[in-house]
């Protein structure tokens, strides 16, 4: 039987507190299971302890962000659905994931999530 989309677990990786917390609250109100991390290192700890279906991550973060974070995701988590959010991306670096440019509407992000899950 197909899993209800809202049963999937979403990990938000965002270093800006206001964005991370309001996005978490928005998705939880919509019925999603949400985990949060403020940087790539925190995300790795969460990923070691939890089964995550979708990762929504900022590109530019002060701790394990940018190109190295993208390389890590591509190398070790290519089986996950990953959405990159950013106001700035390195144009010389190929990003193999869906990209949602900031600022974005939270409902637009939810549409991205549903598409990634094949809904």
Task: Outline where the language-model segments fall.
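Hydrophobic/aromatic residues positioned on beta-strands within the core alpha/beta folds
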Residues: 84-86
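Receiver (REC) domain active-site loop signature in two-component systems and cognate sites
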Residues: 61
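Active-site residues of response regulator receiver
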Residues: 58
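Non-catalytic signal-transmission and effector/linker regions of two-component phosphorelay proteins
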Residues: 1-9, 105-119
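Two-component/phosphorelay signaling modules centered on CheY-like receiver
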Residues: 16-35
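Short amphipathic alpha-helix used as the core "switch/output" element in two-component signaling
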Residues: 45, 67-78
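Helix N-cap/capping motif at the beta->alpha junctions
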Residues: 36-45, 66
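A Lys-centered signature of the CheY-like receiver
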Residues: 102
């Amino acid at each position: 039987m197909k899993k209800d989309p809202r049963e999937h677990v979403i990990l938000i990786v965002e270093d800006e507190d206001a964005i991370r917390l309001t996005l978490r609250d928005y998705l939880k109100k919509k019925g999603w299971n949400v985990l949060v991390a403020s940087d790539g290192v925190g995300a790795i700890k969460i990923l070691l302890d939890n089964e995550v279906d979708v990762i929504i991550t900022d590109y530019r973060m002060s701790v394990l962000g940018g190109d190295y974070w993208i390389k890590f995701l591509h190398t070790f988590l290519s089986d996950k659905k990953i959405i990159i959010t950013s106001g700035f991306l390195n144009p010389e670096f190929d990003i193999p994931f869906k990209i949602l440019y900031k600022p974005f509407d939270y409902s637009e992000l939810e549409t991205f999530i549903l598409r990634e899950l094949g809904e």
